[in-house]
Amino acid sequence: MRNIHFDAVYHMPWLEYRHATPEGKVVLRLQTGRGDFSRVIAKVTSNYNYPDYFANAMQVEMKVAYRDEFHDWYECVFTPEDVRVKYLFVLESDEQIFKLDAAGLHFGADYYEDISEAFAFAYAYAAPAMPEWAKGCVGYQIFPDRFRREGENEPGLEPWTSDRVQNEFRYGGNLRGIIKAVPYLKELGVQMVYSTPMFLSDSSHRYNTFDYFRIDPLLGTEEDLRELCDELHKNGMKLIMDGVFNHSGVEFAPFKDAKEKGKDSKYYNWFFFDNTEECGYQTFGHWPYMPKLNLQNPDCAEYFLRVGRYWIEKCHIDGWRLDVSPEVWPDFWRQYRKMIKTANPEGIMIAECWDDSREWLTTGDMFDATMHYVLSRNIWNRFCHHRISLAQFDSCLNRSLMLYPERINQVLWTFLGSHDTARLRTRAGGDLRMLHAASFFQFTFPGAPIIYYGDELGMQGGDDPYCRFPMEWHNVEGNVTHAHYRKLAHVRAGSSALRVGSFRTWQVEENGLYAYLRQSDDQQVLCLINTALEPVSGIIRLPEEMAGAAVLTDLYADVPYPVQDGMLKVTLAVGEGVILTLPE
């Protein structure tokens, strides 16, 4: 008889465990101890199916979708006969049967199935659909001052190839430079561009905004931004702007007025003048040059709603990445979402959140996705710092996938470097092989992989400000890392399994060989990657759909891999990965 971990059995009618899809199907998930049960069934009925209720209930088999060291997460997807759903779970282990409902876990097949104690999905409203373009798209982050300079040099600029960097330095990157780089981005395989702030400021990062309705003249004009949007759209790309609405700069006119006039200013309550900090007002990160905004104030909230709407309507941007999202009044984000979806139904709203983001994502009334720092840290810890085993890495991945519905997992921004973090190659100790391995995984995992400008060239740099050196345009031609990223982006664009398919751990080897399955409605691919610092070999048991083939094709290198008796022998060099599929 198995030793069942009863305290691991868990289900709550919250969105990560129970939700509807945009197509109106229902997804149920159940947590159990790893390997504790041989079969799990969801019994589903209608809240109005009286008097029989569960006597003629739909019985839906559940399968293990995700697994970590200690847990299995079962999942089923079905179309309900009635959108007013009641359900419970039947769990089998050897000859023992248990039932789980809202009252708890019960022993025995004969336990009375009480409709009043069943879990309730009061009304299975279809979830809001994500913009199709955002699902699995390849993004590219630009820091405007450091990306590309076009036109006459402004006086006082730091030389582009300078070997020193500080946030107060200006290098003169501008919007005309980004426009000039559109063909480069298209050739690389970019489908969406995200730019850090562009508004008037006295810093190179522009997170201390002075005027939210004015493009910084060092970058260009509103007309330049409109032209950039038009050029990106003509070439099949989107533009996401950075909105800094948690705080402003000290030269923001309402803040200046409030600081000068005190309580006599109509803007006084746009900020927090409460002397909790030495400067006399609340700030972001205890930096006095970034006073915190009070978006609970209706006038302040309305101002920033107008800001968001203005740039969508005037320049046709495709959405906003919102800075320091968790520190902003949540009701403002609900208003902001309504504004975005009204101004541009295909627009997207991305949170900057460094932790578990369920509070901001699973309710469906705030953000579409977040910057997936939880995943980033797991990838860094395995591929760059080698702090965790492959088994631990796999467990972290499965737990992170369990946090959100699939429609959210498809659009989460997966990134390995940004303006706030050390560059990927630097994290990897300068080792291009591990940069290649980490980015291979990034591009073959669910979500929207984001390239930080210059990472595709193997640029180096530590934490802010050293991750913000100007783009090395002289290093593009013949760059093997650039070719690697370009290949990954184009393979991903042509593969529905990689863009929107499910993820399933397939094989985890102690030597660092990792196999995982990606599957969409019309394609299955098996990804193999060497996560170790030395070559690895192994024998991979192939999935049923591939086991009968004589040969499999690697989409990355376009080479054949022979199959023998449903098995595949493979040796991978450091940093190497393959994307296997049936030959056409």
Protein language model features and the residues they cover:
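The feature marks proteins involved in alpha-glucan
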Residues: 1-25, 29, 49-139, 149-165, ...
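Carbohydrate-binding surface patches
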Residues: 15-17, 26-29, 506-545
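Conserved, mostly hydrophobic/aromatic
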Residues: 30, 142, 185, 195, ...
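C-terminal beta-strand-rich structural cap/linker in extracellular carbohydrate-active enzymes
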Residues: 34, 564-584
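Beta-strand-rich binding/interaction modules
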Residues: 37-49, 53, 87, 535-557
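Substrate-binding/active-site clefts of carbohydrate-active enzymes
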Residues: 137-139, 143-191, 198-314, 336-344, ...
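Aromatic/acidic polysaccharide-binding cleft in carbohydrate-active enzymes
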Residues: 145, 363-364, 368, 410-432, ...
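Active-site-proximal helices and loops of the catalytic beta/alpha 8
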Residues: 229-237, 252-259, 313, 323-407, ...
